[in-house]
Structures are given as structure tokens and as C-alpha cells.
């Protein structure tokens, strides 16, 4: 039970009820007294009331006193008596009467004297008071001694209880259970042993009164009663009465009715006025009309009636408690509105015994209008709906409606609970009253206050649209503000914007998205007018990040991005090219364009669109790929390949081509060449000879858009010929050792061909590597001695053969074959003999000399040891064998028959001397034998008086001749004189011959050692002392430097210049007084004329080598070929040019290099590959190629353009930095390569540059300075080097600035020289030579 139920209070009683109840109770008590039969009793006799229930379930209220007695609102308990001692009743409805009891149940008045056997039994046993837990019994006894009796009262239930009563005829029995049937026995006794017969009475205790009686619900025509039942309560009866005076209650509304048979735990729906309508007119209230509730009960499990507005349930049973409730609920329906009622509830036992009553008052609700609601409110009308508290009779009501506005009011009557109120004003406050009327009675009215909303806006429109904003505007005259609901299509929620203006910009939108804008005008008190809606899409976002995923010659795959969820976008593409335009569309963010033209630029514009709303366009440009090249043709030489190809696209004139040249086996170092636009051929240089290459040619257009696949071609460069090879003889072997440096590049071997006359032999040699300058060596055997062979070696690679390298080599020599015979010796005089012999066979080499050997000893086989003995040794007796004569000869190879024709006769003893051997007179009468030694190689021992070194010479001996004996001397004096004269003549002749040969040999000397022209003077100064030295020499206007320079003027001028002065060479000199010394001039190879070796150039000593530099004049038109021939033959990699071609209107140097196209200078092709023009100098790169051998190498020209025409550079740092630039480049060149330096004459500026280079090295390596000595050395190799005093001072200034920069760590070296003088002047022609050459001043 809910707490609210416990707090329920009975409704207050009306004044009429308060005075009526005591009168009613008095009447009921009088009736009880009358029904008792008039018999007095010492204890009040309680009445017994019986409530009977008929079979039809309707409770009947008995009108007879015998069946129903009223006593204080309670019924008399039912009592039964019996003589049985065990107290059992003979029947539930039987009364056991004693003999003295009358027929009407009254007790008799007779008395009886107790017999001797014991007391008489009691009689007239009554239960004068019955409550739920106790019973008061009374009884009678006619014995005279009854006052002395004691009585034993017993009852048997679970436990028997005995009560002894002494000297009184009544007993109060307590501790009983409610609504329980008890049998009490009463036994009288005297003393402790004499007992009378017992008498019994059956009594049922009252049930417990109901509790927690409450009104659980009240309505207009209904009320719900609820109470709790105690244990033993079988059912309940309700007495329901309307309360009020006759004036307050009409005949129809007056009610008094009993409702019986209400069982615990059951819900009932009962209409008490049904009985009221069927009762007999004029019957007293409360005695007629009753209702048995058994037919109205319904299960508690059923759904309760739904309450209406003014109903309230109190304490419903909790069905989840798990216990069956004993509460009873009665719903009374059909009551009168606004009426007071009193309900009295009696608990009943199973036999109808009722407990004490419980009463409660309540009032039904009056008729009322409630929940007045305005619906369909517009600016000019609204619809009212409401409810009434009396739903059952609502159709009988009419309603008065009063509408009061701010300035007007109106009334309206309707017959149903709804009404339409027209003619209202917008944005106006109204008070509305609805009053129910039933007949003449008005119920409680309902009230409503309402504001009419403003008029809907007009001209609601979109003013501006962007990707994230939409502007809106409208018109309104009565709204205070406006509420805008923004709903995105496809989204469930919406956002709200509030504004007091009549326009708004809605931001934060998504591009390309449809939005609906519902505007609601807001009036007073938050009223809202009818909405207006407009829908519009934002502008789609422009696409971005357009990406060409893949492109071919005819297709292009594009994708792009959009910054929003653009699933509904349509993308329109415009594809434009020089061939026209095309349009297409797609729903995807990618598309493949087909049918395109190769190598064509397409401009693609993409515009997003959704629902005919177009976004901003975005575009990209892309070339389709060119088609692949075809028909590749390759022509090669050793280091270059010229390629040509074809492409048949219409756009091919706009193509360039990218060539990737990859050497086989070296894919990581591919060479790339890109042609100019429209060029379909290219020459690739700096390739490796004899190597296999693969070229891939991509056509490309625009910004490097290449063809999908390259055209491929494999080729091999021509193998490089070897520069030369050397032949070495094998001592005393008929073989040749061939040596050469492996040619550059790769090779598969060499073809060696050796021939001599008709004999020919070819051999394949293994390959070699050109890395690290590897020398190749092979030996050719089984040749003939001293034979000339034509040898050809051809490099082979990739199935190609290089140009053969040829040489003529002669095999070596060995000891000549000894002759078969012996010399013929005959006596000429007493001291001389004649020896005749034939020449040795020269098949082992040309015979270079013969030696005549005499011996006085035995004839044996001579050995090489005898060659060391002379006539003097013979005379001293050191040896009996000696060499007496030596013949030098040059016999070529010949056959044996020819050698026999060649005869030699030697006079021995003529006292001649040949190469240290004295042909002295023989002893008269002496016996001599002779043999001849033939030499193919004769070697003299320098430490043994220049005599023949037999061990080192190639010699063989003839056999000794027969001995010859000399006669006696006929004239010693004549012979001696003759011998002396003859010996002197021989010596003079031989000496003159030797002198003549030596002079001839010196005239043909090709090169003079530089050791002969070492500087003879030097002024070596330490670096730390140079600044003081400079200041000293600089004093008095450079007086000290002037004296030094004066001392240098005559250095070297006396050296011969024969080659330069030859008539054939005079025209090759730019200036007639600047001629190269013969001792150091550069000689070129002789081609068709002996003077072809001349060029006006000299080797110049540098710091590291005597040939570090070549100083030359600026080329003339007729010496351009010679100039480039010198560059090639002397392996020049760098040219230093220190003049402009034209200075002050005079030609100083011919422009000897090509500017655009490659140009041939005789056998040399020169092509410029790059040119960098800077303010102080220009750097040009060339490729120099020998047309005959196809060999080439790079060449860089450093053209210094900041040397004034008459003077020196403005600052020393320019020339010093220029020098370092040159030296950095030379680190990449071969170390033996000289630097070619020239100006106009090749002496002044050229000498200054060379001197600076040497001075910097000297300072860095020796910490000393020798300006004077270096200039002296240069002038010993070429005249006029460092030509002017200004240049000499400038050299010293450069040294000073270098020394200072090292000391101060300065970078910029600044030196100003304001003096100048004439350097090179062409004077009037000299008629002596008939040439235009002048002299240099």
C-alpha cells in the first residue's frame, strides 16, 4: 500500500448526518429490546443479527427482528448450545435449549434445589459480548446454593484452555482468534469433588474490522474505494449513502444501498444507482435495495480502468510482491457529479458474522473544462480543443466561448468540444474562456491565453550562392525575429540561425550540397508564424590535384580530387588541342581519354556540376606520348657513334630525342644525350673504343614527355689502333720481342702479321686491358737473323678490325758463321807479311769488322781472349798471339758464294794503328801464323785502353793458316822511316775522318739538351725578406727593378735561330724579331718537306719539367694547320690565350677556333662543345680529333680578356686567380701534357704568365723567390720573355701580394699600375725579305 493511501482522510460529515446518526442508533436499540421477549437478565442480552446472501448473489437485508437485529451497528453473534459434554454442536443453525427455556428462546424463572448427587447443570448460557479476540459468557442456575458454586469453563482448539470461575455466573474469555468458531463447556461444582453435568455453547468470534479504508480515486461520476482485510475475513458489506438535506438532494440523486459479498483480493465495478432505479417507491431508505457484488467482481490481474483528468488512484497493489493481496477495491460508477457520499464497510466472517464498521466520506468532482488547447494557430485563426471531466455526458453539454483580444472581443457557442476561432489579428495576445453548460447549470470554465503568430514571410528568395555560403532575403511587416532552419539533404539533423534582419548569409555549408532553408517568423511570446521553405544547392568545389596517372600515345588516364563528398557530381571535361576540341562527362573522379593524337599538347578543363549548378573550372595541360622511333642507323669510329632515326608522327617536328647510351655490363653509368628540337641524328662522343653499346632513343616532347618504349640498337665502336709498337731483338736469337701499350678501350685480341719478301705468317694474339697503362709483350720466334720484317698489328673487337699499326723490324745478330778455310799468309819482306782472306758469311748479321790475328805459337783454335792482346803485349812477351790489324766494314747479308768473291788483303807489319791496335813490324826470321776474326758486333772495353771486349762482342774465328817464316832484314833504317811516314798518314787520315763524321753528326742533332742553357744568374730571396727587398728596389721610381731588367736585355740573344731564318719559314713568323731559338724550338713531324717541322714556338721550362709549357705566337692565317698539328702531336690539353684577336684596331691573333660547326684543319678536326663568357675571361671546350686515326681528346681554351692593350692587368688578383683556375683543370690532364701559352708575339704576356706560375710553386715549395733568375731562364729559351719593364715590376708586385696574402690571410689582392708602353707594333714592310712581317719593338 502506498503511503498516500495511509494518509487518506474521511471526508467531513455534513451537519444533517451528525444529528441523524444518534437517533438511528436509538431506534435500533429499542428494536433489540422488543425482540428479546421481555425476560430480564442480570447481564445485558446481546442481540443476534443475521446477514443472509441469496443464491442470486444479492445481499438481502431482513426486516424482521428475529432474523436481523441492529445494535450499535453490529450484528449479534450466532450462539449454539448442546448438552454434549464434548461440546460438539449438533448443527450450525440449531439452538440447544434447556427444559426451562421457552419456545421463543427465553429463559424460565423456575428454580431447583440441588440433588444430593451434585449441582444442577447451568442453563440459559449466552455470549453477551463477542469481539475478535474475547467472548463474555453468562449463564443461570436455579440451585439455591448456586452462589457458592464454582464453574469450570473449557474450550478445545489446538490447546485446551480451562478457566475456573468462583461465585459468579459469567466469564470473560480472552486470547481468541478472530472469526473462529469456538465450543465452550460450563460445568458447575461444589468443593473439589462434586460436579454437575456440563452444558456447552458454540460461539463464533467477530472478524477484524477492515483497515486502511481510503478513496483511491474520485471523478465526476465515479469513485474508487479500497481497504485491507484481516485474517478470517471472508467477505465485506458496504453501506453507501448519499449525504445532504432534502433540498440538496433531488429524488434521483438520493441513495442508500447495501453492497454485500465483497471478497478480499477482488476488484469490483458497481453502479449503485441500478438498484435505486428498481426499488419500490415509498420504501424506507436503507431497508430496501441491495446489491450482491459477486457478479461484479473481476480479477485483479485485469487492467484497471484508465483514469481521466480528475481521477486519482491511491495505493494500488504491487503485483510484483509475489503475495496475493487481501485488499478489496470497489469502483463505484454512475454517481452524481459534485455529490457527497458516506461509505460504511463491515467485515464478515464465513458464516456472516460482521465485525466493527469503518466509515469514510467522499465527494464526486464537479463538471469542469480542462486541457484547453489551441491547435492550427495561424495569423488570423486558430482551432480550440478541450476536455470535460464528465466524458459520459459530454454530448449533452454546450459550451460558451469568450475571446478577448487587446482591442476587441467576441463570443461563440458550440455543441462539441472543439471550435474554430476566425477573424483574429496576427501577433496579438488573446484571453479565451470555455464554459461548459448542462441545462441551466454552468460548470467550471477552462481558460487559455494565446498569441497569434505573425504572417508568413513573403518574397523568400536566394540572393547569392557560393561553395560554402548561400544568401537569403525576404519581406515581413509584423515579425519580431526570424528563425532559420537549415537542413542538409540526406542529413537527419538541422541547425538553426536566428536573425532580426530580413536577410542573412548562411555560411559553413558543404560545397555541391542541397540545402533547404525553412524560415519561421517569430512574434510575441515566442509565437511562430507559418514557415516558408526554399531549397538550393551550394556551388560545387573546383576540382584540384588533377593528376595524369598514365599517358600513352593515344590515351590519357586522369584522376583528380574534390574537397567534399561529391558523390553526386558530374564532371564535364573540355579537351582542347591544336586539332580541335571535344567534350565529355563522367560521374567518377577519374577518366580515360581515348583516340588522342601522339605527341600533342592537350589542355583539359574540368568543371564540376550538380543539379545544373556549375562549379569553377580547373585545368591541366598534358602531352600525349610520342610514338616510338624506328629505322635506327649507326655509324661508328673508335670513340664516337653517329646515329640517325625516324619518327612518323605529325608532331615529330616538335620532338627532341633523348639518347641513353649504355655500355655493355655497365648499366649504372649510362650516357645521356638530348638533341635539339626536330633533329633526328646525333653524334655521341667519348665512347670507349672496341666496346659494345646499346642505345635507347626516346622521342620526347614538351617538358620531357617520352615515348613509352625506346627504339633500341646495339652497336660496337671501332677498336682503337695502337699508337705504335716497339721491336726488341733477342740477343743471339732469331726472334723479335714486340711491345706496345694496350690501346684505349676494349679489344678481343690482335691480328699479328709478319712478312719478309714472299714469306708471310699471321697469328691471333690474346686481348689485353688498357687499364693502368698495361704494356703488351709478345715474342716472334723462328725468324732469320738480321732480317728486316714488315710487321702489322691490328686490334680486333666486336668483329671489327682497327686500322693496322705497321712497323719494320730487324731481327738481331749473333756470332757470324766461322769460315771453312783459313787465311792465306805470304811473306812480303823480312818484317812484313800479306794476309789474304775472304769475307765471312753475313747470314747472322752484317759483318762490322775483321781483326787479323798473328801468332808465333802452335796452330790451335783461337778464343776471344786473344783479342785483348796487342803488338806491345807481344813484344813484351806477355803473349805469343796478338791482334795486329782491325778493319771496320759494313757488309750486308749475302750468300756464301758472294762472300768468297769479296777478298781482303792486309799488309801486316806496316806499323799502322787501327782503333788502338798497332800493326808493328814483324821479327825477321820469325815464323807466323794468321787467322781472321769476323765481327757482327764489336764492343770496345773503355777501361782496357779501348780494346776489343771479346766477351761482349759477337765474333767467330777462322782456322790458323800455315806458318810462314820471314827472311832476314835487308835494310832496317829504310824500313823504319817508311813505316813512320806511313803510320802518320794513316793517323791523320783516320783523325780527319773522325772529325768530319763528328761535325756532320752535330749538324744533324735534332734536340739540344736544356742543361746547356741553365740560368747563369740568380737572385734568390727568402719569402720573409722579400717585402724589404721590394721596397728597396721600388725606391726612386723602381730604380732597382729597372737596373735588374736592364741586365736581362742581352740574355740568350746570341743563340742560333737557323730554322726560323730559312726562306721557307720566314712567312710563318708574325714578327721578324721574335724568332725561336733552335736549341728549344718545337719541332713538328715532317710531312712532304723538310721545313714542315717548323712553327714559331719554344718549349719553356716550368717548375716541374723543362717542357711544362709551349710558348708560341698568335697563329697567322697560313699557320692555322700547323698550330692545330702542334696541339695534336704534342698532346696539348690546355691553351692559354692572353690577347684579344683585335686590339686598338690591329689584328693581334687570328681566330683559330671554330665557333659553331666543326672545322677541319688539315688532318685535325676541331669542334667546340661549350663556351662560358665571363667578365674577365672566357672558357671554351673543344674536341680535337685526328681524321686519320679517328682518335680524339678534349681541349680547353682559357681566354684571358682583361689584359690591357698597353700595360698589365689592373690588379694582381685577376691573373693569380686565373692561374689557379688553369692549374685546377690541369689536374685532370695527363701529367706529360704541356700547357700551350700564347699572346700575340708569345713573349711579353706569355712570359709573364709562365713566370707567375713558376713563382707561385717556388713560394709554396721552397719559401724562396727568384724573379730575376726565372726571367733569365725563360729568356734563354725564347727571346724577349717578360718583354717590358712594367711586366717585370708587375711580377714582383704579384709576389709581394702573394706573400702579404699568406701573412694576412687576405683574399683580394689589389694592385694598380698606371704606366703603359707600346708592346707589339707592326712597322713598315722590310723589302729585304719581301714579306709583310715587322719587327717587335
UniProtKB/Swiss-Prot annotation:
Glycan attachment residues as annotated in the record: 72, 82, 93, 104, 142, 172, 192, 231, 258, 278, 342, 351, 376, 391, 396, 413, 431, 501, 525, 536, 582, 603, 618, 628, 637, 666, 669, 761, 772, 784, 790, 824, 910, 937
Swiss-Prot/TrEMBL keywords: Angiogenesis, Cell junction, Cell membrane, Cell projection, Glycoprotein, Hydrolase, Membrane, Phosphoprotein, Protein phosphatase, Repeat, Secreted, Signal, Transmembrane, Transmembrane helix
Cytoplasmic compartment spans: 997-1337
Topological domain ranges for the Extracellular compartment: 36-975
Signal peptide: 1-35
Tissue expression as described in the entry: Expressed in the promyelocytic cell line HL-60, the granulocyte-macrophage colony-stimulating factor-dependent leukemic cell line F-36P, and the IL3 and erythropoietin-dependent leukemic cell line F-36E. Expressed predominantly in epithelial cells and lymphocytes. Enhanced expression at high cell density.
Major place of residence: membrane
Start and end residues of each Fibronectin type-III domain: 121-209, 207-291, 271-364, 368-456, 457-541, 542-623, 625-720, 721-817, 816-902
Reaction(s) this enzyme catalyzes, per UniProt: O-phospho-L-tyrosyl-[protein] + H2O = L-tyrosyl-[protein] + phosphate
Matches recorded under InterPro entries: FN3_dom, FN3_sf, Ig-like_fold, Prot-tyrosine_phosphatase-like, PTP_cat, PTPRJ_TM, RTP_Phos/Ushers, Tyr_Pase_AS
Biological processes annotated in GO: angiogenesis; axon guidance; B cell differentiation; blood coagulation; contact inhibition; cytokine-mediated signaling pathway; glucose homeostasis; heart development
Compartments in which it is found: Cell membrane; Cell projection, Ruffle membrane; Cell junction
Sites of Phosphoserine modification: 1009
Maturation and modification: N- and O-glycosylated.
Region annotation (Disordered) ranges: 67-124, 278-327
Top-level EC class: hydrolase
Clinical disorder: Thrombocytopenia 10: A form of thrombocytopenia, a hematologic disorder defined by a decrease in the number of platelets in circulating blood, resulting in the potential for increased bleeding and decreased ability for clotting. THC10 is an autosomal recessive form characterized by decreased numbers of platelets apparent from birth or early childhood.
Subunit structure: Monomer. Interacts with CTNNB1 (phosphorylated) and JUP (phosphorylated). Interacts with FLT3 (phosphorylated). Interacts with GAB1 and GRB2.
Protein name per the record: Receptor-type tyrosine-protein phosphatase eta
Naturally occurring in which organism (per UniProt): Homo sapiens
